[in-house]
């Protein structure tokens, strides 16, 4: 896939398409229309057709899309056969929930280890994942760990991000309110649950359905 030719908005929707197509395949469905996809993933059909057009002819007019072909295509496009090993830093309530969940519906993403400073948690396993002391971060992060989930207090988020920048980590999923400064070779996605909730409430009040 030639990433530079695909808008980031399209790239963000690809996992959404893939998950739905997986479910279709498991149900035995052989083909699907853009209208059916639109209804399921809540993306208008014109956008879906435009997204798919970046990859060439994925379907046929009047027929729709072959489910097995789409499944195979997106599996390869999203590198689903490659395991992405993840480290989690911050084993509070949210971090603990992640460890128990550990992407059970996504077989190619696994949290391999976690880090915290709590004496009660360091040296234990949560959801089968070992918890190490934060002091061991650089030592424990092997070259296989390229993604980190950050669920630490906002006050220490930047310092942890600075330490991650000295490892082989190239992607950070930041669940803290802090807006982090990282080097250009690290991609960071910010997910502020409080902001998301405020946005939802605003839309409920100002854009009633």
From Swiss-Prot:
Principal subcellular localisation of the protein: cytoplasm
DNA-binding region: 16-55
Protein name, per record: Redox-sensing transcriptional repressor Rex
Subunit structure of this chain's protein: Homodimer.
Lineage: Bacteria, Bacillati, Bacillota, Bacilli, Bacillales
Amino acids binding NAD(+): 90-95
A Gene Ontology biological process term: negative regulation of DNA-templated transcription
Cross-referenced Gene3D superfamilies: NAD(P)-binding Rossmann-like Domain, Winged helix-like DNA-binding domain superfamily/Winged helix DNA-binding domain
The UniProt record lists the keyword NAD: yes
Function: Modulates transcription in response to changes in cellular NADH/NAD(+) redox state.
Record's subcellular location: Cytoplasm
Family assignment from sequence similarity: Belongs to the transcriptional regulatory Rex family.
Species whose genome carries this gene: Bacillus thuringiensis subsp. konkukian (strain 97-27)
The organism's place on the tree of life at top rank: Bacteria
A Pfam family recorded for this sequence: CoA_binding
PANTHER family (UniProt xref): REDOX-SENSING TRANSCRIPTIONAL REPRESSOR REX (PTHR35786), REDOX-SENSING TRANSCRIPTIONAL REPRESSOR REX 1 (PTHR35786:SF1)
One of the record's GO cellular component terms: cytoplasm
